[in-house]
A protein has these predicted regions:
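Interhelical loop/hinge segments that connect adjacent transmembrane helices in multipass membrane
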Residues: 1-16, 126, 188-197, 206-248
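Interfacial/gating helices of multi-pass transporter permease domains
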Residues: 11, 37-60, 122-128, 190-191, ...
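Residue-level signature of transmembrane alpha-helical cores of multipass secondary-active transporters
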Residues: 15-23, 56-57, 95, 134, ...
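Alpha-helical transmembrane segments and their helix-entry boundary regions
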Residues: 46-49, 65, 157-163, 193-194, ...
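Membrane-interface helix-capping segments at transmembrane helix termini in multi-pass transporters
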Residues: 47, 81-89, 105-133
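Small-residue-rich hydrophobic transmembrane alpha-helices
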Residues: 47-100, 144-153, 268-317
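Alpha-helical transmembrane segments of multi-pass membrane proteins
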Residues: 108, 121-147, 275-279, 318
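Membrane-interface helix-loop junctions in multi-pass transport and translocation proteins
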Residues: 169-205, 318
Length: 318
């Protein structure tokens, strides 16, 4: 019992609580979007939005290969401002470049992919338009995630909380003006979700980049950018990405495609949002806590593991 108690005391429970609040914010505006789509006329809104589920699985493969290793590499460079600044600049170029290439590929082959995934012919055209808009939003999204990792690495955790709440507020406002059926809304339907994501992700990314610039991490200097660290980055990322590739591709073919075959993509999308947004929130945020703690202190693996298992057990019991 003493070992468990000591391990729990070593876990940053305050940060875990903050992560829960951070995770709750996107869950709230996702739930609001489900409500707005439910108010739209016709039966296809959920089905069209549901097509993004398997598209996000493709992006998740790249995300886990990029974002997860970043916690380690950004954390390890924090003591050297020049090294951190170089990794920040080159990391933005690499992650943005990879996502841009992937998005271009998805935009070009959206309709063949929808046909392969057995989407209903009645919604292929509308779904293709929505997926293309979201593909642009995903590029802005990965850049936002990257700079948020940078804020955590330099110890500006409170700003991350602020921007998470701001994202919730901005999404509610833009969704209301773009998606809702209110008199002043543009009534863009499902496509409004994609436009909302582009607007919010872009604005927040620009603001955070300005903050990092004022902190002295994005100043222009004569020092040549070095991509040498990317060799180790890609080695670690490839392992994480390979595991995610096998898992997500199998899920796409065995679950997502089957859902389209039986014509229940809309129901699946709503249920999936509830499960991942509400039921699994504590477990997902615990994972974020572990990544942050281990990236800054490798000894946390030894001292906190028992505490992590205890928290997980408590969550499962609840």
């Amino acid at each position: 019992m003493n070992k468990i108690k000591n391990s729990l005391q070593s876990v940053n429970l305050k940060f875990f609580a903050a992560l829960l609040v951070m995770g709750l914010c996107p869950t709230i505006y996702t739930t609001l979007r489900v409500f707005f789509l439910g108010q739209l006329p016709g039966d296809w809104a959920y089905s069209i939005a549901g097509q993004l589920s398997w598209v996000n699985l493709i992006y998740e493969i790249i995300s886990e290969a990029i974002i997860l290793p970043l916690f380690f590499f950004m954390g390890s460079a924090i003591l050297n401002k020049d090294d951190f600044s170089n990794k920040l600049k080159t990391g933005l170029i690499v992650s943005g470049g990879i996502y841009t290439i992937l998005s271009i590929g998805i935009i070009l082959f959206t309709e063949p992919l929808l046909t392969f995934m057995a989407a209903s012919p009645d919604i292929i055209k509308e779904s293709a338009t929505y997926i293309r808009i979201e593909s642009v939003a995903n590029v802005a999204g990965v850049l936002l995630n990257f700079v948020l990792v940078a804020l955590i690495a330099i110890g500006r955790d409170k700003l991350v909380y602020v921007f998470t709440v701001l994202k919730l507020a901005f999404c509610v406002v833009t969704d209301t003006f773009l998606i809702s059926t209110l008199p002043f809304s543009l009534n863009l339907g499902v496509n409004g979700i994609g436009y909302s994501n582009i607007i919010v992700n872009t604005i927040l990314t620009i603001v955070i980049l300005m903050i990092l610039s004022k902190e002295g991490y994005l100043v222009r200097d004569k020092q040549k950018l070095s991509f040498a660290w990317c060799k180790d980055f890609f080695k670690i990322g490839s392992v994480s990405g390979l595991e995610s590739f096998v898992r997500n591709i199998a899920y796409m073919l065995m679950v997502s495609r089957m859902v389209n075959v039986v014509g229940e993509s809309g129901v699946y999308w709503v249920a999936n949002n509830f499960i991942w947004g509400w039921m699994l929130l504590p477990v997902l945020q615990l994972g974020e806590l572990i990544k942050q703690e281990v990236s800054t202190d490798k000894n946390k693996v030894k001292t906190n593991t028992l505490g992590y298992f205890t928290i997980t057990t408590f969550i499962c019991i609840l």
